[in-house]
Amino acid sequence: FGNIKDEERRKSELDMKALSLFKRIAVREKFGVEFLQRNGIDAVEVIDPTLLLESYRDLLPHKVEERNEILFLSLSDTAEMNAFAKGLSVKTGLPIRKHYGYLQPERKKNMEFLPIEEWLYAIASAKVVITDSFHATVFSMLFGKPFYVYISEPSKVFRISNLLDILGIKRRIVNDVDDAIAAPSINYETCLLY
């Protein structure tokens, strides 16, 4: 269900009759459960599999040394998200290091893609993370990093918003530098993940 916002489009992309043949259906988002229930299909919400492993530190290629920088992990790389990152960089005095989540052919010449271990290390070693990615958000939390979720496309907010709402840290979703600076820090000791 991840990024599909429009209910009619979602219905057309899913075979509702085939789904109704399953005895049990588990999905990762509350809105997915609600969508299926509105269509007569029973479903339950389950935790994202990335949250099932207690620690990912064994996957890191070397000991974590914190880098004094903002890590920019983007799926969409919009002008607005870049402006937000630059504004946060100016306010904090931290430089930005960019990495991208998938190949965007029109920009591939300037993009750096990391193996998963290095991607995880980039998050674990960052001072702050800016992202629009669900999984970068999850790993920022798992590594206890301050992070900001910048949503350029509203269709991407559901899964991230659902998780942050459950954890009581929904104010990490921002689109304004001043809101980001004013957002309360995350107490990972009381956060549901720990």
Language model feature labels by segment:
Residues 1-194:
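Active-site anion-handling motifs in enzyme catalytic cores
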